[in-house]
Amino acid sequence: TDYEPEQFGKVNEIKNGKIEFKNVTFSYDGKRNVLKNINFVVNPGETVAFVGSTGSGKSSIMNLFLRFYDFKEGEILIDDIPIQHYSQEVLRDKIGLVLQDPFLFHGTVASNIRMYQDIKDEEVKQASEFVDAHHFIEQLPQGYDNKVSEKGSTFSSGERQLIAFARTIAANPKILILDEATANIDSQTEEVIQTSLKKMRNGRTTLAIAHRLSTIQDANQIFVLDKGEIVESGTHTELLEKEGLYYKMYQLQAGMMQE
């Protein structure tokens, strides 16, 4: 189907969650390309991960997908429809963003999960149970009505993450963006976080940025970025067999790198 410019911003539903980048090249300053000819397809319900050193382009891919920046070269499609045709509302509501350091605001635990949306108490509770946040919330003096201080400073980083997971699930997104969601977690909460993430990803298309390769070994596809280009792709096992950049990164993290 051909889409005309006057249809921009009119599509207000993400049906399946297929994602495609076609020949996307992007520069923040118009001089230096931070992404060069990026091509990939993610089928509905799949998890793909992007790995690479700082500045390799991982975050830029997410920035473009979330429409934080406009790109001039190439196409980004959701369900074979150019991303410009989707309304900002549907992109905001149906793409769940899980950040490294989730933002909690002054209010109650429930209002932080609800996030200004018309979500019933029962749904707030169901979302919390789904991500295993219910247990610690129930133990708070006022439970879901417990006050949250600015930035949620009274909670551990793991608890903040679980509240953010509940917030994401309550909105029932079609697509998840995970930005190193386990970077700042105390080890005892790590297992709960990993289990919850797996449940959240189930049936949803997921784009994950990872620094720790141990967290993305089960991804359907891993893309290795270097200086704005995808230099390797495959499953964890396939990439190890290639003995390329991913293999080196994995060896380094596993602490087996020989001097």
Regions from the PLM with identified roles:
Residues 3-259:
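ABC-type nucleotide-binding domain
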